[in-house]
A protein has these predicted regions:
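Beta-loop-alpha module in the N-terminal Rossmann-like domain of NAD(P)-dependent dehydrogenases
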Residues: 17, 47-108
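Short strand-turn motif at the edge of the Rossmann-like AdoMet-binding core
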Residues: 93-94, 120-122, 150
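Predominantly a Rossmann-like dinucleotide-binding segment in NAD(P)-dependent oxidoreductases
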Residues: 125-189
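Short, Asp-centered acidic motifs that coordinate Mg2+ and/or phosphate
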Residues: 31, 65, 145
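N-terminal Rossmann-like dinucleotide-binding module
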Residues: 1-47
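Rossmann-fold dehydrogenase core element
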Residues: 104-122, 144-146
Length: 189
């Protein structure tokens, strides 16, 4: 059985996920929506099999799984609508633009019995797997602490330039976009 997927938010991450999901026969990322018509047009060029729906609600109604790649300021209503409709959720982070908004979203989602996952790609990669194996074998010695040092020649990174909201602290910034991966990573270690 294939999983029918709606993608809400067709910027960089939405388009990347569309391309990668299409490679897997267990997923049908056929239902798309974004308020930006240009992003919708780009997504259809990338994947002519999919269809831009008239609204986010239409996309959600057709899917088994809803991937939310929209900016965090607008994510909550889509997430709650999908959960209320009994749809599994795959979320980008951060959940909201501050801790209160994020906590409210999580509390709201807990009222529904739907699977929820967050796209922390580095948490399932070879680097973490290798590190956990080395830790288990005692090859690292005693863990005394963690230093996270992140630098980039430019922010946002070149591949993220289309997501202008990432440049600004209220919704993005390097800490929310990058450091969150490393915090999740180190928490697992």
């Amino acid at each position: 059985m294939t999983t029918k997927v709606a993608i809400i938010g067709l910027g960089i991450m939405g388009q990347r996920m569309l391309t990668h999901m299409r490679l897997h026969h267990d997923f049908e990322p056929d239902y798309l929506w974004d308020p930006n018509k240009s992003a919708c047009h780009q997504a259809i060029i990338l994947d002519p099999q999919s269809k831009v729906m008239d609204s986010a609600s239409d996309a959600i109604s057709k899917a088994d799984l809803v991937y939310l790649a929209c900016p965090p300021a607008v994510r909550e209503p889509y997430a709650l609508a999908a959960a209320a409709a009994g749809k599994a959720l795959f979320l980008e982070k951060p959940f909201g633009i501050n801790l209160d908004d994020s906590a409210r979203l999580m509390a709201g989602l807990q009222a529904y019995n739907v699977p929820i996952a967050v796209n922390f790609t580095q948490a399932s990669g070879a680097a973490l797997t290798d590190l956990l194996v080395a830790k288990e074998r005692g090859e690292m010695g005693a863990l005394l602490g963690v230093d996270v040092i992140v630098t980039y020649p430019a922010w946002p990174r070149q591949w993220q330039k289309g997501a202008d909201w990432l440049r600004f602290r209220p919704e993005g910034g390097m800490t929310r976009e990058v450091i969150s991966h490393f915090l999740f990573f180190t928490e697992r270690v």
